[in-house]
Amino acid sequence: MKAAEIRNYSDEELKKLLLEKKKQLMDMRFQHAMGQLRNTAQIKEVRRDIARIRTILRERELGIRR
């Protein structure tokens, strides 16, 4: 998910998306530990999506526009 796509969401939608991504990351970590996750690069992608969402929420909180 690109930052430009994320910026189109409202704050409430971003908070919901953040919770979904955190749950997805937790599930992926369990799958990885059990040896069921084939594409481990997905964990990295989800972590980065979470970081992007949190960054955009923080920018909005501080009133920073990009």
Swiss-Prot record:
Family of this protein: Belongs to the universal ribosomal protein uL29 family.
One Pfam family hit: Ribosomal_L29
Top-rank taxon, per record: Bacteria
A cellular component term, taken from the record's GO annotations: cytosolic large ribosomal subunit
Keyword Transmembrane: no
Protein name in the entry: Large ribosomal subunit protein uL29
Record gene name: rpmC
Ranges in a coiled coil: none
UniProt cross-references to NCBIfam families, sorted A to Z: L29 (TIGR00012)
Matches recorded under CDD domains: Ribosomal_L29_HIP (cd00427)
Keywords: Ribonucleoprotein, Ribosomal protein
